[in-house]
Amino acid sequence: MGVLGPLEYDAVNRALTRLYNGRGTRLWVVYVPNFGGLKPFKWAENAMVASNFTDSDAILAIATDGPAFSFRVPNAVITGKAIDLEMIRRDRISPAVFRHEWARAAIAAAQGLDVAPS
């Protein structure tokens, strides 16, 4: 059984689809119990390399037992856009993760990246 119920899954999927259709950015959301002893940043980096991510692929990796997370976004996704990754991490994703609001964290990440070029 996953960490998202059917309604949460649908809400996250809608946000990810809207981001991809509108901006061409594919946000991969991964929920794992833990990062296997790795720092969240390193775990996400390894996943990106192993999965052959492109410049339009971002990742939100959440360790639900931690809780901990890593939000990795290539520069190509944010260049020319008013996107503050640190604010998205600190003010939107982190509070949701630490309240165990897994769907809210993913939706916040997708909405934070869904910004038109400035």
Residue ranges and their predicted role:
Residues 1-118:
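A structural boundary signal for the start of the first folded domain, especially the loop/turn
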